[in-house]
Amino acid sequence: MDIVNIAWAALMVVSTFSLTLVVWGRSGL
């Protein structure tokens, strides 16, 4: 893997994690 693929993978993980936290926060969990 090169640095670009690693950066994209990290970005997707962080984005998904952030969206999950927002959804959980709004649903009251």
Swiss-Prot record:
GO terms for cellular component: chloroplast thylakoid membrane; cytochrome b6f complex. The keyword Translocase does not apply. SUPFAM superfamilies: PetN subunit of the cytochrome b6f complex. Keywords: Chloroplast, Electron transport, Membrane, Photosynthesis, Plastid, Thylakoid, Transmembrane, Transmembrane helix, Transport. It is a single-pass membrane protein. GO terms for biological process: cytochrome complex assembly; photosynthesis. The chain crosses the membrane at residues 3-23. One of its GO terms (molecular function) is electron transporter, transferring electrons within cytochrome b6/f complex of photosystem II activity. It is found in: Plastid, Chloroplast thylakoid membrane. Belongs to the PetN family. The 4 large subunits of the cytochrome b6-f complex are cytochrome b6, subunit IV (17 kDa polypeptide, PetD), cytochrome f and the Rieske protein, while the 4 small subunits are PetG, PetL, PetM and PetN. The complex functions as a dimer. Component of the cytochrome b6-f complex, which mediates electron transfer between photosystem II (PSII) and photosystem I (PSI), cyclic electron flow around PSI, and state transitions. This is Cytochrome b6-f complex subunit 8. The gene is petN.
